[in-house]
Amino acid sequence: MKIIILGAGQVGGTLAEHLADEQNDITVVDERAATLKRLQERLDIRTVLGNGAHPSALLNAGAEDADMLIAVTDSDEINMLACSVAFTLYRTPTKISRVRSADYLAKHQALFESGSIPVDVIIGPEQLVTKN
């Protein structure tokens, strides 16, 4: 499976490590060159330096034939916009976004339910913790 991961922090790096072990074709996009270099030195993955919400970065990452986009940057807005760009321009079939703000998750869930923001799976870590 061809998977693009946006964000090379702790979550993105861990995802890349686990998914690369499962023989997936992984590309990680991030704006921090040193972080990408460290990931690439220890994993068999591709990296792209850039903003994951920019169409050119997604294209360089292979979005035109990617099976999945996982957006786990530290910005909800970049994550949601990246999913929208990937769907609109490249028809990426599966889009997963980390969304941390309760304002998006609790008060304005209709944004996702209506398809206005094309996210197939929302990861809301703070919401999960507070619900349990």
Q: Which residue ranges define each predicted feature?
A:
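Cytosolic regulatory regions of ion transport systems
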Residues: 1-132
